[in-house]
């Protein structure tokens, strides 16, 4: 059996507020909002394209959470979203409270990236893919071509 990424899980002092930010910022949908037997509020949000669930929860009963860290660091460092226009998306996310950390950065292959600090000190990457006729044709046909992270 091939392994498939099932979800990403974010911890937040206010899970509903954080989930609503991702709804506005990236078109997530809130599918579940419950208090689990662990005592934490648990919200399930699939991404706009349905490719991955992002679970957002608070601390469990008796659990103390350390601070978030939006800086570059070891371990799970960020998650990325495709962008059709980097500057437009950066400006839109900043109006929602995100803060630009790095970029836009031009890669030698033509793609551009930027990193932002999202709620709860989560590091988010925006990726504006290189414009090319073959990539446009593939996208129109429903395919996404990625060459070595293409940045």
Could you describe each region identified by the protein language model?
Residues 90-151:
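Vicinal oxygen chelate
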Residues 39-41, 61-67, 102, 134-136:
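A short, acidic/glycine-rich surface segment
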Residues 4, 39, 75, 110:
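Exposed loop/turn and edge beta-strand positions of beta-sandwich/beta-sheet ligand-binding modules
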Residues 58-62, 128-129:
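Acetyl-CoA-dependent GNAT
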Residues 21, 87-92:
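Short amphipathic alpha-helices within nucleic acid-binding modules
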